[in-house]
A protein has these predicted regions:
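A gly/proline- and charged-residue-enriched helix-loop-helix capping module
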Residues: 102-123
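Catalytic-pocket segment enriched in acidic/His residues
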Residues: 42-49, 53, 63-64, 173-296
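N-terminal non-catalytic cap/leader segment that marks the start of a structured domain
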Residues: 1-109, 276-280
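A short secondary-structure junction signal
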Residues: 91-95, 122-125, 130-131, 152-157, ...
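A generic local secondary-structure boundary/capping motif
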Residues: 69-72, 99-102, 126-135, 140-141, ...
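Residue "hotspots" at secondary-structure boundaries inside conserved domains
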Residues: 72, 78, 104, 133-135, ...
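Short, structured patches in soluble enzyme cores that scaffold and shape functional sites
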Residues: 114-116, 123, 130, 137-147, ...
Length: 296
């Protein structure tokens, strides 16, 4: 864990050095699970931040040591929803279909439910699924819910946001197109992999509606660039919509959807085995994943 852009530190060591050890906090299990940490709520978050700020230098983790690697910053997602927040992407889709944007898109922030058990972390390989010939990526911001609730208002939404990370919404475009031609989905066209990382930056650092530069690169070549603040739908809109008459939970992940021109589909380009995708978002970091070999 890190704070204020400093190097990562040993959270367990910091917590013990600060003299904490409340047996009511799930017996300390949250020390090895970011989801449990999020579920504990704001009071614990403040204690953790204080312990980190007071940590001596010998708790800093050497990221250059052999064998060090970043893991997925969220060890378990409670759920995964991926929205379609950017009008620029929707307009490109309508142009490809020679149609117009559906009226309902302007009425509510639509989303699909993804596979929250198929989450990759930084530098994890994305296996090429045996059922697709057209693999793609999508550059997105992901928001992690911190405090659950129901019927959340736009005005109170910021209190429910834990933080943000970079998200790669891997997509099997041929399968996705066939599924959605049957008026449902996507399903297998998306469910095989979603990547998150390299870290979660909390909302107290970025604000609840951050406007951040977003860049996607494949094999070092820039494919697209955008700003998260250009989204038509805000995080408050998404939280208010999802929580209308139903509960949302700590650790729920909301993907923003990709901006126009920040995926292969919008650019008429496709991935191939061995490609390295780098997605970078200002103030969060760079998420890198490589595409695995195509199955025989």
């Amino acid at each position: 864990m890190a704070i204020d852009g400093d190097p990562p530190i040993d959270l367990i060591g910091c917590w013990e050095a600060a003299g904490h050890g409340d047996p009511d906090l799930q017996s300390g299990q949250w020390l090895t699970s970011s989801l449990l940490l999020i579920e504990e709520g704001p009071e614990l978050w403040r204690l953790v931040a204080d312990a980190i700020r007071a940590a001596p230098a010998d708790f800093i983790v050497d990221t250059k040591v052999d064998g060090f690697r970043w893991l997925c910053p969220l060890d378990r997602a409670a759920s995964l929803r991926d929205f379609l927040a950017f009008e620029s992407h929707v307009l490109r889709g309508a142009e490809r279909r020679k149609s117009t944007v559906p009226e309902y898109w302007y009425e509510a922030p639509v989303y699909y439910k993804g596979n929250h058990r198929a989450i990759l972390g930084p530098d994890d390989e994305c296996e090429w699924p045996s059922f697709t010939h057209r693999l793609d990526f999508e550059l997105e911001v992901a928001m992690i819910v911190g405090v659950g609730g129901r019927d959340i208002t736009h005005e109170s939404a910021s209190a429910h946001i834990f933080g943000f990370t970079v998200m790669n919404d891997f997509s099997a475009r041929d399968v996705q197109a066939r599924e959605m031609s049957a008026w449902l989905g996507p399903a297998k066209g998306k469910d095989f992999a979603t990547a998150l990382g390299p870290c979660i930056v909390t909302a107290d650092e970025l604000g609840s509606e951050p406007d951040l530069e977003m860049v996607c690169r494949v094999n070092g070549d820039e494919w697209g660039r955008a700003r998260s603040g250009d989204a038509h739908w805000r995080w408050a809109d998404m939280l208010a919509h999802v929580s209308d008459g139903e509960d949302v939970y700590p650790g729920d992940v909301y993907g923003s959807g990709t901006p126009g021109g920040c995926c292969g589909l919008d650019l008429g380009r496709e991935l191939k085995p061995g490609d390295v995708i780098e997605l970078e978002i200002e103030s969060i970091g760079l998420l890198r994943n490589q595409i695995g070999p195509r199955p025989e």
